[in-house]
Design a protein with these regions (language model features):
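Positively charged n-region of N-terminal signal peptides that target proteins for export
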Residues: 1-4
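Bacterial N-terminal signal peptides
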Residues: 7-15
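Short, Gly/Pro- and small/polar-rich lid/capping loops
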Residues: 13, 20-29
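Extended, loop-rich substrate-binding clefts of extracytoplasmic carbohydrate-active enzymes
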Residues: 21-25, 34, 76-125, 139-144, ...
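Acidic-aromatic substrate-binding/catalytic surfaces of carbohydrate-active enzymes
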Residues: 30-91
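A contiguous, surface-exposed recognition patch within enzymatic or periplasmic domains that forms
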Residues: 31, 38-40, 50-52, 58, ...
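Short, hydrophobic/aromatic-enriched beta-strand segments in well-ordered soluble domains
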Residues: 37, 106, 256-270
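Terminal connector regions
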Residues: 267-290
Length: 290
């Protein structure tokens, strides 16, 4: 069985070298991390990633739906708060610290008594690491898991390393096994659809000449929160947006304790077609050092 220690994961799993994190403030009050050709724009409201670009090419959906835009962070399981998202984590202003990293810290959630901190760091390989901390501000021992949600356009192909029978509900999204991975070509339907999967610690999306890979800790099937999963893909109805979702281990936190969880983002051009191929698989493994 794979072992997981929340407070040690960041050092044990992510093998990237930090670069100088250049942070600029835009005219409209957003914060932009520049790392060579790669830029990431973060809003202090909700600590949301609103843009992730290679040059002028954008990978995050720029369509704004209520409570469903940009890249955000929630606590899991969702059944503890249902809907809409917890305002202190998803839309209220975060406290900002700038230095060799960009750090944003939320208010304490009135409903859940957690506080979230997000730390953004540029790396020498042009990737950007987002480290999340959940702190238990209650006087009770609690269990919680970290959860990152990123909206992208309904285009291209989504893929990861998991057998088809590890994707549930079976057949809800048309994943196909090819080149040792599971692939889903974006389509549309008249209803919302969502799948869970037990992957291998990474999730990739390719569309419009860009390849994005997100790398995180690889979980055993027993480690996610109840009714949740390491990898989730949500496809909103019609041709609107898709959510790329990843979760960390369901972890017990004593009062005042915290967990840390890290996702490293990679973005690069891809000249081939956005469809299953050995070339796309090789590009992912090279880019994210898998």
């Amino acid at each position: 069985m794979k072992k997981f220690i929340a407070t040690l994961f960041m050092a044990a799993c992510v093998q990237v070298m930090a670069a100088a994190t250049v942070v600029e403030e835009s005219a409209d009050g957003k914060y932009i991390i520049k790392n060579s050709e790669v830029t990431m724009t973060i809003d202090v409201n909700g600590g949301k990633i609103l843009s992730y670009k290679y040059g002028d090419a954008e990978v995050i959906s720029q369509t704004r739906f209520p409570n469903s835009f940009g890249s955000t962070f929630w606590t899991s399981p969702q059944k503890e708060w249902n809907w809409p998202p917890v305002p202190e984590f998803d839309r209220n202003p975060y406290k900002l610290e700038k230095g060799d990293k960009l750090v944003m810290t939320s208010e304490v959630s009135q409903k859940l008594n957690y506080r979230v901190t997000k730390t953004f760091t540029a790396n020498a390989d042009k990737s950007i690491t987002v480290s999340y901390t959940i702190k238990n501000e209650s006087d009770e021992t609690r269990k919680v898991a970290p959860w990152e949600i990123t909206r992208v356009p309904n285009d291209g192909v989504i893929f990861f390393d998991a057998p088809i029978d590890a994707i549930t509900p079976a057949g809800l999204l048309d994943f196909k096994p090819q080149f040792g991975l599971s692939w889903y070509l974006a389509d549309e339907a008249q209803q919302n659809r969502k799948i869970n999967a037990d992957g291998k610690g990474w999730l990739a999306y390719c569309a419009n000449g860009l390849l994005m890979v997100k790398k995180f800790e690889d979980l055993d099937a027993s480690q996610p929160a109840p009714e949740e999963a390491e990898i989730q893909v949500y496809v909103n109805m019609r041709k609107s947006f898709i959510e790329l979702e990843s979760q960390g281990a369901h972890t017990e936190l004593k009062p005042g304790a915290e967990l840390k969880w890290t996702v490293t983002w990679y973005l690069a051009p891809f000249d081939g077609k956005a469809e299953p191929s050995e070339a796309l698989k090789k590009k992912v493994k090279s880019l994210a050092k898998l």
